[in-house]
Amino acid sequence: MRTNVGEDFARALASKDSARMRELFADQIDFQALTPGRHWQASTPEKAVDDIILGVWFGPQDDIHELRSVTCGQVRDRERVTYRLGVKRNNTEYVVEQHAYYESDGTHITWIRILCSGYRPESME
């Protein structure tokens, strides 16, 4: 079964595969994202992956233990991927969902906008 670049990105993120994520981004990428309380920008794969995605959002202390869902689609000429992750941080279970709209050359993501739900507690007790 062939996956698209967006699904490949979601799977690489879920496994925290930094090399694969950098490989999926074009050398010059227009990366912007919105998380609760902050706007992020990067123009290189290293900045986007190492400094932002795996440097802050899902750092070494965060265990992404499950890719709960991934869906892909298109909005005219723009691709879309939505993924939901199960993450353990500081001994607490969370759900994190992100929606990404992106453009690619078929192999590399050249433009991406990500919107993140933030870390939502698994249990609302």
Language model segments and positions:
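Charged, low-complexity, helix/coiled-coil-prone segments
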Residues: 1, 38-46, 95-100
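Short acidic-aromatic low-complexity motifs
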Residues: 1-28
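Short, mixed-charge, low-aromatic patches
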Residues: 3-13, 38-39, 54-58, 111
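Hydrophobic alpha-helical core bundles mediating ligand binding, dimerization, or RNAP-core interactions
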Residues: 6, 13, 25, 49-53, ...
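Hydrophobic pocket/interface hotspot
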Residues: 9, 21-22, 29, 48-49, ...
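Alpha-helix C-capping/helix-to-loop hinge sites
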Residues: 12, 32, 87-88
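A solvent-exposed, acidic/Ser-Thr-rich amphipathic alpha-helical stretch
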Residues: 20, 26-76
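A beta-strand edge to alpha-helix "cap/lid" segment located at domain peripheries
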Residues: 53-125
